[in-house]
């Protein structure tokens, strides 16, 4: 039996969640006040998120919480206290990058669905099979994968597969970029990316400018747009 795909949208705030659901999204992923990959976004506070979970369920929708950064060892106990209220409220799934977080969530909340973030760089069949073995219910494929690579993973493993179909692209492999850390001391894997790849740069060769800075967005890829291959996806 052919399944209908879930339309999932990012929600940078609770207000954005309302708009996404009104526009037809089946689910949203949203960051809270801690441990998300968008530390400088208008993230929801805990009370607002608890209300958002209720709102989603009241309207037959789902809400997934992002914990898609690398955590320090001393933050693990704080993570438990952070997640517990959302779990008790009926959170549908948590999206994780860190394998340590993955293990702890599995131990603390055995029945909570875990989605393996694109930041985990799950790029092949063996990775998918291992994540299933560990207890993942869904894998989010890296934006770098081709349609054939996604198809191959789907054929080899019966995990749910989530793929981005529109939006910005990083110039580096998902979860592997250190540019922001090196250039500005802000780690993308801690949710603090300064996005230096979006800045303009000049290109010089032998002391001569061959591409002026005002035309030099050389590290900023064009946005992902898969509308022409949505039927195949």
Identify what each model region corresponds to.
Residues 144:
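Active-site loop and adjoining helix of the penicillin-binding protein/serine DD-peptidase-beta-lactamase fold
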Residues 113, 135-140:
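Acidic, glycine-enriched active-site microenvironments
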Residues 124-126:
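Conserved nucleotide-cofactor-binding alpha/beta core module
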Residues 2-122, 148-233:
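Active-site pocket-lining/capping segments in soluble small-molecule metabolic enzymes
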